[in-house]
Regions:
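N-terminal phosphate-binding or glycine-rich loops at protein starts, especially the Walker A/P-loop
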Residues: 1-24, 108-109, 115, 121
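Short hydrophobic/aromatic-enriched beta-strand-loop microsegments
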Residues: 4, 19-32, 74, 118-119, ...
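Glycine-rich nucleotide/cofactor/substrate-binding loop typically near the N-terminus or early
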Residues: 10-81
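Flexible, glycine/proline-enriched loop segments at strand-loop-helix junctions
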Residues: 48, 86-101, 114-120, 132-149, ...
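Active-site/ligand-binding-proximal alpha/beta "capping" segment
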Residues: 54-110, 366-375
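ATP-dependent carboxylate/acyl-activation modules
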Residues: 76, 157-159, 165-452
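Short alpha-helices
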Residues: 98-115, 122-125, 392
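Non-catalytic interaction/clamp surfaces of large macromolecular machines
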Residues: 123-124, 128-176
């Protein structure tokens, strides 16, 4: 009681229908809402009431002369621009019509005068504000927090609009960039225990991305868990078009350690495990096949950090959910195509590197040797090539029968990577295929591979 509620069109009708007495915005401004609601609150009677500093006698005197009352609390939900452009088939005209003008103007004005006006843009803050009102008044600390929320909110809102308009114009790398992300979770620590960390979702979460995954079992994901799992999913995506085979990818410290294609998930997992049974311990396993009881039973024999799959049978979950330290994630849409225009970003000290997301495959192949590769050899070459694309440089991968044999990642010279991958391949190196993530500057790598 004691509060006068000023409301615009739709909000006023909802409140009045619910038995809440309101004052229409037109009664405050003395001017009707017009242009299909485009102009409602853009009026001095509103903005002077928001911006007048109560501690400034001149401000208060001017309000009195103009017959304008102060406004103490503003509650606004902006037009749903994000929801609008997320709809399939949305037109440019519909998108533009859902760009809020009066709302952002009003909440920014209110936030500037934070000492006198509380402004609420996030429904999650309603309870806090109401409890303080019931206790006697909104504290200055809360008003400053709400001020911050306003400018963060409008920054995200404007970012969505500018990025949408840039996309419509085909602008890949604009003069300035802003990206909107929403916090998904805080983490116990980052890459190392002394580093704080959080995980943020993109405003538009991509189908098949880690942010879409549903955690079925286990503790919260750590910083390193998310980084490694993302690396595994990016490699797994290379096999999305192979609908005849199931792929299993094992990753350790952001590098593949065992990768295989097979007719069943269980067979593919066993081959991936056998490729490097030492490194996969404590690793990440992702697959584009359903995990059944047989697969789960094999997976449960060792310590794995995370398993990601599009689906699990009830029997598989019963087995896996007995593993205390395992995280089990379900990710439908794991074979979905990525949209065009994705960007890859890397923060560097004082700047941001932005490039097109690497969705490139192999175009036309040239065989300079007299002997052409057999169909099977070509299959293994292409398989090894997909692996090396997602292995830290200098990288060499060796594969046979569409299973990784030896992976040599992150070496400072290429011959070391070759020697490492050959050593790890063991006897399987005979008749295998080798891929390199860059050219051979000298013949030493070729000679080492031929000698193996």
């Amino acid at each position: 009681s004691g509060w006068e509620i000023i409301a615009t069109g739709g909000t006023q009708k909802l409140l009045e229908d619910s038995g809440v007495k309101t004052t229409g915005i037109s009664d405050v401004t003395g001017f009707p809402e017009c242009l299909d609601g485009r102009v409602k609150t853009l009026h001095p009677a509103v903005h002077a009431g928001l911006l007048a500093m109560r501690s400034n006698p001149e401000h208060m005197s001017q309000l009195e002369k103009l017959g304008i009352n102060t406004i103490d609390i503003v509650v606004v939900n902006l037009y749903p621009f994000k929801a609008t452009i997320s709809k399939p088939g949305v037109t440019f005209a519909d998108a533009v019509e859902n760009i809020d003008i009066g709302g952002p103007t009003m909440i920014r004005a209110a936030a500037k005068n934070y000492q006198d006006v509380a402004v609420v843009v996030d429904p999650r803050d309603y309870e806090r504000v109401l409890s303080e009102l019931e206790a006697g008044g909104i504290t200055l600390e809360t008003k400053k927090y709400l001020q911050y929320k306003v400018f963060a909110h409008t920054a995200v809102y404007d970012s969505l609009i500018s990025n949408y308009l840039a996309q419509q114009l085909g602008i890949r790398f604009p003069e300035s960039v802003t990206f909107a992300y929403e916090k998904a979770q805080d983490m116990r620590y980052g890459e190392n225990p002394h580093q704080g960390a959080s995980y943020y979702n993109e405003e538009f979460i991509r189908v098949g991305s880690l942010s879409k995954a549903k955690q079925l079992w286990g503790k919260e994901l750590s910083y390193n868990n998310i980084n490694d799992t993302n690396c595994a999913l990016e490699l797994l995506r290379e096999f999305r078009d192979n609908t005849e085979k199931i792929a299993v990818v094992g990753v350790k410290h952001a590098n593949p350690c065992g990768v295989a294609l097979a007719d069943t998930t269980a067979e593919a997992y066993q081959k991936a495990y056998d490729a490097d049974p030492v490194s996969i311990f404590g690793g990440i396993v992702v697959t584009n096949g359903t995990v059944d009881a047989d697969t789960a039973a094999e997976m449960a024999k060792i310590f794995l950090e995370i398993i990601v799959a599009p689906a699990y049978t009830p029997e598989a979950l019963e087995i896996l959910c007995k593993k205390k330290n395992l995280r089990v994630l379900e990710l439908p849409g794991i074979r979905e195509e990525l949209p065009e225009g994705l960007l890859d970003m890397k923060k560097v000290m004082g700047g941001l590197l932005v490039q097109e997301f690497n969705q490139g495959g192999i175009g036309e192949l040239t065989v300079p040797t007299k002997r052409q590769p057999t169909e099977k050899e070509m299959e293994d070459l292409l398989f090894a090539w997909k692996l090396v694309k997602h292995t830290k440089s200098n990288a060499i991968t060796i594969a046979k029968d569409q299973v990784s044999c030896g992976i040599g990642p992150g070496q400072v010279n290429r011959i070391w990577a070759v020697e490492q991958s050959i050593e790890r391949s063991g006897e399987a190196v005979k008749g295998a295929a080798l891929a390199s993530d860059a050219f051979f500057p000298f013949d030493d790598c070729v000679k080492a591979a031929a000698a193996a």
